[in-house]
């Protein structure tokens, strides 16, 4: 399946989810998430879920990690549309809604890419090789290419993988893991 076709199909499928389904599936995602190894995690890059896109509730996941790792630093991305880049800043209680409808932290404390041990990665879908299907802007792939230290890249998906994304590019950075409400996937 090609990215544009898959993106359109999966976005529609996710938009058709009821609030009840999302809440139930978020709980199931948390169960799968709790089975992953976070023993070496000190800083996590996450994202604030966009309700208008029925994104999985990452707040449940990061709250679990905060209980597991009391000194955990959580960072959220700030997007610079003019340069097509993003950077992660330490998350605070005060988030600001940007022009794209994404909540971002204030930009007081930049977290260098090499300091982030694990990322929760937004996506519409993924394939059996760990290729991620996002919204098509390439922000995450560009950012991941700046990470020199090994890090976990965990996709969070309501849906099982599609067999194959046919039009991947050499600059696409694959996930290391992905969770769905029913399964965990690990990619090499």
Model-assigned labels for residue ranges:
Residues 1-97, 103-107:
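N-terminal active-site beta-alpha-beta segment that forms phosphate/nucleotide-binding
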Residues 82-188:
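Conserved phosphate- and dinucleotide-binding cores of soluble alpha/beta proteins
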């Amino acid at each position: 399946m090609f990215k544009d076709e898959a993106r359109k199909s999966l976005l529609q499928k996710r938009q058709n989810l009821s609030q009840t389904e999302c809440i139930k599936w978020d709980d199931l995602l948390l169960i799968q998430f709790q089975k992953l190894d976070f023993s070496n995690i000190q800083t996590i890059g996450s994202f604030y879920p966009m309700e208008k896109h029925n994104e999985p509730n990452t707040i449940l996941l990061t709250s679990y990690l905060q209980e597991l790792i009391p000194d955990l630093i959580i960072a959220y991305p700030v997007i610079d549309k003019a340069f097509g880049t993003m950077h992660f800043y330490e998350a605070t209680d005060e988030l600001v809604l940007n022009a794209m409808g994404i909540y971002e932290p204030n930009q007081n404390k930049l977290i260098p890419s090499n300091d982030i041990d694990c990322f929760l990665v937004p996506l519409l879908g993924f394939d059996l090789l760990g290729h991620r299907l996002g919204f098509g802007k390439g922000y995450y792939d560009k950012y991941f290419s700046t990470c020199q230290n090994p890090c976990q890249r965990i996709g969070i998906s309501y849906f099982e993988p599609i067999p194959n994304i046919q039009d991947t590019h050499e600059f696409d950075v694959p996930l290391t893991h992905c969770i769905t409400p029913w399964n965990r996937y690990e990619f090499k």
